[in-house]
Amino acid sequence: MAGQGDCCVKVAVRIRPQLSKEKIEGCHICTSVTPGEPQVLLGKDKAFTYDFVFDLDTWQEQIYSTCVSKLIEGCFEGYNATVLAYGQTGAGKTYTMGTGFDMATSEEEQGIIPRAIAHLFGGIAERKRRAQEQGVAGPEFKVSAQFLELYNEEILDLFDSTRDPDTRHRRSNIKIHEDANGGIYTTGVTSRLIHSQEELIQCLKQGALSRTTASTQMNVQSSRSHAIFTIHLCQMRMCTQPDLVNEAVTGLPDGTPPSSEYETLTAKFHFVDLAGSERLKRTGATGERAKEGISINCGLLALGNVISALGDQSKKVVHVPYRDSKLTRLLQDSLGGNSQTIMIACVSPSDRDFMETLNTLKYANRARNIKNKVVVNQDKTSQQISALRAEIARLQMELMEYKAGKRVIGEDGAEGYSDLFRENAMLQKENGALRLRVKAMQEAIDAINNRVTQLMSQEANLLLAKAGDGNEAIGALIQNYIREIEELRTKLLESEAMNESLRRSLSRASARSPYSLGASPAAPAFGGSPASSMEDASEVIRRAKQDLERLKKKEVRQRRKSPEKEAFKKRAKLQQENSEETDENEAEEEEEERDESGCEEEEGREDEDEDSGSEESLVDSDSDPEEKEVNFQADLADLTCEIEIKQKLIDELENSQRRLQTLKHQYEEKLILLQNKIRDTQLERDRVLQNLSTMECYTEEKANKIKADYEKRLREMNRDLQKLQAAQKEHARLLKNQSRYERELKKLQAEVAEMKKAKVALMKQMREEQQRRRLVETKRNREIAQLKKEQRRQEFQIRALESQKRQQEMVLRRKTQEVSALRRLAKPMSERVAGRAGLKPPMLDSGAEVSASTTSSEAESGARSVSSIVRQWNRKINHFLGDHPAPTVNGTRPARKKFQKKGASQSFSKAARLKWQSLERRIIDIVMQRMTIVNLEADMERLIKKREELFLLQEALRRKRERLQAESPEEEKGLQELAEEIEVLAANIDYINDGITDCQATIVQLEETKEELDSTDTSVVISSCSLAEARLLLDNFLKASIDKGLQVAQKEAQIRLLEGRLRQTDMAGSSQNHLLLDALREKAEAHPELQALIYNVQQENGYASTDEEISEFSEGSFSQSFTMKGSTSHDDFKFKSEPKLSAQMKAVSAECLGPPLDISTKNITKSLASLVEIKEDGVGFSVRDPYYRDRVSRTVSLPTRGSTFPRQSRATETSPLTRRKSYDRGQPIRSTDVGFTPPSSPPTRPRNDRNVFSRLTSNQSQGSALDKSDDSDSSLSEVLRGIISPVGGAKGARTAPLQCVSMAEGHTKPILCLDATDELLFTGSKDRSCKMWNLVTGQEIAALKGHPNNVVSIKYCSHSGLVFSVSTSYIKVWDIRDSAKCIRTLTSSGQVISGDACAATSTRAITSAQGEHQINQIALSPSGTMLYAASGNAVRIWELSRFQPVGKLTGHIGPVMCLTVTQTASQHDLVVTGSKDHYVKMFELGECVTGTIGPTHNFEPPHYDGIECLAIQGDILFSGSRDNGIKKWDLDQQELIQQIPNAHKDWVCALAFIPGRPMLLSACRAGVIKVWNVDNFTPIGEIKGHDSPINAICTNAKHIFTASSDCRVKLWNYVPGLTPCLPRRVLAIKGRATTLP
């Protein structure tokens, strides 16, 4: 673990495995990892190096142990830590961190946070156990946790249980502060105290489930916020003092333990799960999801700016923008602060995510340059005590070094090490080398002993085999004995060598000490054999102890006499250490190297004798009076050394005695064992002899039996003998062949070694060659990139020079004009000419100003000088005319001064111009480079889409081939054609993959060039500017911005103009095709071949409607209009059906088409403006003509606004007043013609002042009148009743597929549900009431009140005349035949209450009763006998004849939100349910329905969010979801037929069918109604039905009803004339047209 100081941020890269969807779509892997190196390659040769790199197959445990485990250990030492997970959405960040809890997650797949929690509490338990074992006070730990969520730049507390999820958008009270040390902390955050691992895991799970997630096109469950899970660890542990060097310094007596104190360490661990960076066009996010994505990207951008500022190697950036985002503010400690930080960058390996992967790797690469300042979080008292202890230990160590002579002070006062210390270091090094040598020799001796044992055992076995009485047991016993004998022999030799060494040491000590009297006789005692008596050894030890006591007493007397005992003590100790080291080295050498070092021992003994002689002489010379003091000191030192030697000798002798005692015990044990064996053998011998003696008295029969037994055993032994002899021969033969085998083995080994050497050399050569090729290729690529870069620079320079040339030409033109003006000034003129000229100066001045305005921006100063010269000339003329007598001199000087100023400022303007040109070139380079990258990205995306299309087509062909093989295997020609088509598609896919790879390589090269350009920072140029130059640069920037803005506006205007023309051309062609098709249909009855032609065209056009065309109608697809599609290949698919349609229709003979159309028909094929005029005037064609009257009755109308085409310019629309006047004028004409279409839908925002009812209900004082539903004669009560008022047509929606004819108003709050018959309409609202309407009279009949809360569902049973309304957990049953009263109340738990159970409820009920659940929807069986109520996650079945519950449908894990009922062919009910758990389930009920019934089928795959609505027509089921998508299912095959992911911009709330037509209606929360073709599930048109969300939709035989949150129900008519089998492209273009015949 790194200590205190600077610590770089570590970066790890994890590459997730490919998804199955990516594999199916043919995505290639664009990343690779260098084996054994933390390096990842992107594309071909773009390499990134990090601290850790984890490839596709890396497990979670490896990531944790490599990256995070050390950080947890650092937390116990007081270091902060942070783990950051960064990457694009869907890259596996949440999986890596472990915050996405799933029931199916195994232990191996646990993320970083659960593993860190287990590690943390395991470390706490281990430290407490270790302290208990050591007998010290255990540390105390306090763990707390916080869980924050940063959602849309608002900090939310995920542990706050009182927070309402609906208040997510409100501002939180959490504040971020900074303490005195620069640390970041938050206030207002819930901090939970944790006591166990399970408790912390539960808190993590609770917070993770409260986190904001949603589904996008890239990820089913995408994190929509940044999450920060923080663990605070507070540790109070015992801090022991370090062992001081000298006990005298510490002052502690012997046996006193060192004092202990407590220190407090704190640490915090941040686990940061960042939300993924995302592109809106990839995720398909709209509305709230788009806002979340923008907020996420803003936070990550701020984080990137902070990383760039901290990782700047040049240290130019002074300010770090931590406060730009709350995310960077919270992570201020982790980035550049006090924390050990690791960033885990999660990337996708697929080539479709190449740009996101590249940006993530660049992002992470910048983070490696950040340096954090890591310190231990310790309380101040503990820090001060630790610092003082460290200082004391340092000073004590230094003092001991001075005392020991290790450090010395030189003459100049400098510190250094003594020669003794250096000598000791050398000796220690030599000692280490000798130890290694001894160890190696010991291993060699052991190997030799083993070999000797083996050979001797083999020899003994051979001897026994020759004798014929050997077996395996005896051989094993012999081998064990031999091994034991060798071991004992080795130990004996070691003991003898040690004894010899001890004898030599004792003799040296006796020779060196004149005071030892009993040492010499001890040598013969030790010189005996190892079996000498223990009394002799005891006697030697006793004598040595007596000598030791005498020496100690002598030393005490000498110390009393010594005046400098401290100095002597120091010297004696030094000599003692040296002698100990010398003796130890000698003992080890003699013990381990007895064979090699005999001579060296003799020489050592001689040297030692000489040393002892010199020491004796030194002691004997003590009588010299002059050197008495010095000799006295030497004697004292020698005496001290001898005492130590004696002590050591005694210890060695005692150890040797103990070892001998141990050997004696071992020998005695073995002797006893052998004696026991001998005794057992003797007993067995006696027993056998006794048996033999007793055998003589046995009978003949027993003798024969024993004889037979012995003969049998003898035969067996003979067979064993033969086998042993054969084995012996084989053994002899093997011994003979052993030498030959050994020679062959050596030869083969030599050959193998040579081959290995050759292989190594060859591999080395191959590596060198590969490295050389790689270097050459890299060099060539670099040269190519350099050349390309140089070429681009040259092109930019040429462009800049051309621009500079044009500017110079303009300046030259301006100078020429100035020169000509000056020449005109110098030319003399007559008074008449001057008089005429006096009339013209204003024109001349104006012309000069005009010319100045037409030149470039840099020529303005010259233009001003020309105009000043002209004004000067005017003043001179006025002087000649006598107007101004004085200003002659003043008229010429200003011009001269200006020219002087200009000459003085030439150098300044030149320098500023050069700086501006350099900046301009830099800007042009950056713009061109970014444009190139954007174009390459677009090309790569286009290729990826094309590859996906080809893969889908290839899969379809493969399935077709498999089906053809299964049905008719003999069709070889068809199979061959399909195989060829599949091969062609595979070749095309390979070609596209090559193109994608080239794009990736080019992008990488451009990114490298971009980095080089970024290195030349413009700040250097700007910082070197003076104030005047800066003003000039700012002025140039402003002018350039204005010019660019003007160019952009002009381009946009041109684009809009071209788009308008293109739309007009498309609509003209589609109108003509439509007219031709309609004309052909009329003639088709008499011409069968024409019918076949039309059918073929329709089939081909239906087949041509691909998924790309569907995207034109889908708001969430790749584009919202065909003008946004930039690829040429995409445009090829758009019009592929129209030329074929036109060509086939034009090929039909004129006879089939009948008479030609007149001039009024041709007007329809004109532009959109002419069509609008024809429609608005109403006289564009003859209505009397029956042909046109019949054609107009089948008018085609499609939406003009929506997702099909972009909105047209507002400048082309007429004002509302003009349209209202034209509508009023055209109204009488339309009312007289029966052939025209009914009134179209109302405008988007109808005027509320026309509605008397809404004006009256807006007054709160009259709110009580709303509850009156009686038939009073009061006019006020009649007005307050709900009415259905007709709605006039509006031009804005005349081309829509639906036209609003009426509007029902009467509810005061949003309408949630409705049901209708041909005469009655029933509505339920949030105002706790239901209303019944008469569709014939257009009035409200009755109001059904008394509901506890919102009425969420209402159904009418035509068989019984009962109405069922749902509110909270109650179903009210109303009998409308008598007086519209509630006759029964049904509950969700299955209870039946007579009458109205909620009549006493006056206020709105918020909660349900105990045991009850919210009922979301009800449905009636087609026969009217069963009622199905969706309550909770089940559906309760009611039998209406008895009003009793009979069963329950179960199987969902979430609340059932919607259901629908139909009948099968066997007249059984088929119930389909949709739940919040994203699944659609089907239940088929039999005749007897009782108990709990499970689903018969689960429709797969599920939606990405909860199901909101269902609709069934025949065998087709449609389901609409909150994920904005609609799916089409086949009930017979029970499979998914088709799906449109983004059918609407918001939740799909309602589905219904247009009666009698194969058309589906869908409505969403955005208020949009869409019409779909049921057969091929293609859009026909759409209309903005309401400004508020549409909650329900139903139909009857005449009308379509939509209920909305704007408190209204609109009645719609379908506009006839749309043909669902027409090509979608034609239908989409017709949506822009008006009424077409």
Curated annotation (Swiss-Prot):
Biased composition annotated in UniProt, kind: Acidic residues: 578-627
Gene3D superfamilies in the cross-refs: Kinesin motor domain (3.40.850.10), YVTN repeat-like/Quinoprotein amine dehydrogenase (2.130.10.10)
A single cellular component GO annotation: dendrite
Pfam (any one): KIF21A
Residues given in the record as ATP binding sites: 87-94
Principal cellular location given in the protein's record: cytoplasm
Interaction with TRIM3: annotated segments: 400-1099
UniProt WD repeat ranges: 1306-1343, 1346-1384, 1410-1448, 1451-1493, 1502-1539, 1543-1582, 1585-1622
Annotated stretches, region: Disordered: 509-538, 552-628, 830-865, 880-906, 1194-1251
Compositionally biased tracts (Low complexity): 509-533, 846-865
Residues that bear Phosphoserine: 579, 1149, 1167, 1215, 1241
SUPFAM superfamilies, per database record: P-loop containing nucleoside triphosphate hydrolases (SSF52540), Prefoldin (SSF46579), WD40 repeat-like (SSF50978)
CDD domains in alphabetical order: KISc_KIF4 (cd01372), Rcc_KIF21B (cd22262), WD40 (cd00200)
PROSITE patterns per record: KINESIN_MOTOR_1, KINESIN_MOTOR_2, WD_REPEATS_1, WD_REPEATS_2, WD_REPEATS_REGION
A Gene Ontology BP annotation from the UniProt entry: microtubule-based movement
Modified residues (Phosphothreonine): 582, 1237
Subcellular location: Cytoplasm, Cytoskeleton; Cell projection, Dendrite; Cell projection, Growth cone; Cell projection, Axon
Coiled coil: 376-604, 631-824, 928-1016
The entry's keywords: ATP-binding, Cell projection, Coiled coil, Cytoplasm, Cytoplasmic vesicle, Cytoskeleton, Microtubule, Motor protein, Nucleotide-binding, Phosphoprotein, Repeat, WD repeat
Ranges where the Kinesin motor domain occurs: 8-370
Subunit structure: Interacts with TRIM3; the interaction positively affects motility of KIF21B. Interacts with GABARAP and GABA(A) receptor subunits: GABRG2, GABRA1 and GABRA2. May interact with GABA(A) receptor subunits: GABRB2 and GABRB3.
Record-stated family: Belongs to the TRAFAC class myosin-kinesin ATPase superfamily. Kinesin family.
Alphabetized PANTHER family for the sequence: CHROMOSOME-ASSOCIATED KINESIN KIF4A-RELATED (PTHR47969), KINESIN-LIKE PROTEIN KIF21B ISOFORM X1 (PTHR47969:SF32)
Functional summary from the UniProt entry: Plus-end directed microtubule-dependent motor protein which displays processive activity. Is involved in regulation of microtubule dynamics, synapse function and neuronal morphology, including dendritic tree branching and spine formation. Plays a role in lerning and memory. Involved in delivery of gamma-aminobutyric acid (GABA(A)) receptor to cell surface.
Protein name, entry field: Kinesin-like protein KIF21B
Source organism (scientific name): Homo sapiens
